């Protein structure tokens, strides 16, 4: 990058990350420019949250148009644009309905709550489990952290939320073994959390063979 070492943050900003001493001032598409005018190819994309690129003309105009009308009214009221987007998304996917969230962690947290709700209802409150993959990453809330198959991220935040067991990614035999163990112990599997592509785990792809085998 041409920069050495980390950048100290302002004392008023909570220190959570070691940051590069780079401050970006503008972006266009997949490109960024720092305060010195140096150009960078942005392969990080806000940790995969800016997939449309920076300063996208269509997105920018849509946001400005909406901000001039209504900024936020919550789910207490009918939101026509939200309903239209949900219809579009269900047409393009296998989903029958959608639940809009602000982040991946919130989406996974909601998924975990839905699985737990289903498990407690279906299994009459009996011990039910959620299976997740080793080397996975599902977020930094306490529940998603508990579902993350990497102890290094859980260190210092114990105890984790109970009810998770982990299998080897792309290993259907490992999954079947967990199911057998749960059945033997009188436990029920209420759901499975899995990433089609593991990012934190090393950009690992979930193979079609594993999917065809039943997961």
Please give the residue ranges for each predicted region.
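Short, small-residue-rich loop/turn micro-motifs
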Residues: 56, 134, 193-196
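Short, positively charged low-complexity motifs
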Residues: 5-6
